[in-house]
Amino acid sequence: MIKIIYLIVLLVLLFKNNHIIIKADDCPFPQIPIKTLSGTWYDDPDHASCGFEKLTGPLGPGNRLVVALGSKLFDKGANCGQCYDVTSPFNNKTITVMATDSCHDAGYCQADNHFDFYKEAFDLLGSPSGVISGNSGLSYIKVPCPTYGNVKIMMKDGSNEFWTSFLIFNSRILIKQVSIKLSNSQQFIDLNRQPQGNYWPSTNMVSGEFEVRIESIGGEFIYVKIPSIESRKIYDTGNQFSADGCVGNKYDPYAPFQITSNSNNILPPSLYIIFLISILFLIINNIFSNKY
C-alpha cells in the first residue's frame, strides 16, 4: 500500500505544472502524388490573400518560390501556407513551393489541380510555354515546409482591447484550429478562420494577459501566453510542429512542441515518459523490498 502511495505522489510530481514533450510519428497529411497539375504564372507575389505580405519580410517564407492555388485547392484559405514538391516533366527538376495566394483567373484557376506560379518559380520548371496543361506530366505532392525556427503569431493591424485577429505563420504544417483563453475565463474558445484568408479573428477580447492555443492538422498543440493586445506585435511561440514520417524536406526529429497539462485534448505520453515511470517504479519497489 505504501508503495502505491509513493508511486501516485511520484506521478503527480512528474506531470503537475510541467510540459509533456512528444512528437508525431506519422506524416500528418496524405502524401499522394498528383500527376494532373496544370500551371500558369503571375508577377505580383507580395499582395497575396494569405496575409504573409512581402515574401522576404518578417511574415514571409523568405524566398519567392510561391504559388497561388486554384479555387478548389485554395479551399477558402484552408491551404494557406501548405508546401508542395513540384516535379517538372520538362527538365525532371523538383522544386518546393508554398501556397500564399488564391488564383483568380476565371478560366485556368477553376481546374481541379491548378498552380499559378510566381514567375521565378515557373521559370525553374523549364516549360517551353507560359501555360502548362494538366496532361503534360507536371505533378505535385504535399510536403512539410522548409521553415527555420519556431511557429510565430502576429496580431493584425488595428488590434485593440476589444478586438484582434491572429496570423499564425512559419509553421511546417497547416494549422487546424486556433483557440483563446481570456484573463476572465478558464476555458479555451475556438476561433473561426476568416473566410478566404488566413487570419483568426476574436471579437470578445478583454484587457490583460491571455493564452492562445494553436492546433496543427496533426493533432499537436502549441500554447503561448501573450501579456496584452498590441497591433502587429509578433510573438515567437518557442516551439515547432513535428513532421516525422513525411517524405520530402527533412527536419530535426527531436524538435519539440509542448502540450500543457491543462489541455482539453491531452495526447498519450511518449514512450520516454512511460519508460521513465517504469524505471522509477522499479527503484521504489527495490527500496521497499530491501527495507521490509
Swiss-Prot record:
PROSITE patterns associated with the record: EXPANSIN_EG45 (PS50842)
Does Signal appear among the keywords? yes
GO CC, alphabetical: membrane
Q: What's the protein's topology in the membrane?
A: Single-pass type I membrane protein
Q: Which UniProt keywords apply?
A: Disulfide bond, Glycoprotein, Membrane, Signal, Transmembrane, Transmembrane helix
Q: Which residues lie on this side of the membrane: Cytoplasmic?
A: 289-292
Question: Any idea where the Expansin-like EG45 domain is?
Answer: 47-150
Matching entries from InterPro entries are given as: Expansin/allergen_DPBB_dom, Expansin_CBD_sf, Expansin_CellWall, RlpA-like_sf
Q: What is this protein called?
A: Expansin-like protein 6
Species of origin: Dictyostelium discoideum (Social amoeba)
As recorded in Swiss-Prot or TrEMBL, the protein's gene is named expl6
